[in-house]
């Protein structure tokens, strides 16, 4: 009984100790379990969580988004507004902006200065304390050169684009840390990020009419006149009719002669406005008609041929009139004994 009570008392006395141990573990867990970045293979600086729940450094995610806009592990797409509104795992931004020492390193931005992240600041301070003229920094997957004599930074493979840097006290007004704004709660508009991985400012997207609607079809120019593609130009229609007139010239003349009768002269009325054909054409037509009238069998055959030619439509305004008026071309019609017509141009 005593042993049992002693064991029971011992187990009871151990409970607070275990509870205290659990409490101490829970309190020290955030400081011990610092997430590691799978991109830079170091402990995360300003860790952020993507929608896929993978954790990286903010600058590492920024560099990866410029290259592929996908998660480095699962290849899930990174949202467009993630860099403007990242999901920080710990509210350490303002504490990081205060720093641990008296001085901090800054790089130039629009209307203000950005503070370097802690890791890059340590590298710059170490190079500055050793009296180096320059040092290289790996930021968001890009190699940058910090010129400590001229106090500028630039990409190692792009010397033309330079940004001023400075070493100043920790309490100066600043925009944020490594591209993370201190006023994250402020209302921000959708911004078009420029191609800068070191925490550069964003450029507002131009809301002008730079993108035109592609639903409106452009106007086409025909003979110096703007016309819609759906509306044919009258000049184009006239030229098509003129070219088509040469093909139907023989058929229209045959239909007109069938109305007048065989052997009748083809003098046109003044209202038609057609240029009369040369005398050679009339003489050939009359001689052929007289020879056909002497042969009765030929007349019967010609009459049947005329009945077939009556089926050819005769428009209200013959296209031959427009062809003669527009081009000034006089065609000579002649009829062969076999009833076929030929068209020759003079």
Curated annotation (Swiss-Prot):
The keyword Aminoacyl-tRNA synthetase does not apply. One of its GO terms (biological process) is Wnt signaling pathway. It catalyses: S-ubiquitinyl-[E2 ubiquitin-conjugating enzyme]-L-cysteine + [acceptor protein]-L-lysine = [E2 ubiquitin-conjugating enzyme]-L-cysteine + N(6)-ubiquitinyl-[acceptor protein]-L-lysine. The keyword Flavoprotein does not apply. Keywords: Cytoplasm, Metal-binding, Transferase, Ubl conjugation, Ubl conjugation pathway, Wnt signaling pathway, Zinc, Zinc-finger. GO terms for cellular component: cytoplasm; cytosol; nucleus. Ubiquitinated; autoubiquitinated. Autoubiquitination is enhanced upon poly(ADP-ribose)-binding. Gene3D superfamilies: 3.30.720.50, Zinc/RING finger domain, C3HC4 (zinc finger). A zinc finger (RING-type) spans 37-75. CDD domains: RING-HC_RNF146 (cd16546). Pathway: Protein modification; protein ubiquitination. It holds the Pfam family WWE. Residues 91-167 form the WWE domain. Residues 281-295 have a biased composition (Acidic residues). It is found in: Cytoplasm, Cytosol. One of its GO terms (molecular function) is zinc ion binding. It is an enzyme of class 2 (transferase). Its main location: cytoplasm. The WWE domain mediates non-covalent poly(ADP-ribose)-binding. E3 ubiquitin-protein ligase that specifically binds poly-ADP-ribosylated proteins and mediates their ubiquitination and subsequent degradation. Acts as an activator of the Wnt signaling pathway by mediating the ubiquitination of poly-ADP-ribosylated AXIN1 and AXIN2, 2 key components of the beta-catenin destruction complex. Acts in cooperation with tankyrase proteins (TNKS and TNKS2), which mediate poly-ADP-ribosylation of target proteins AXIN1, AXIN2, BLZF1, CASC3, TNKS and TNKS2. This is E3 ubiquitin-protein ligase RNF146-A.
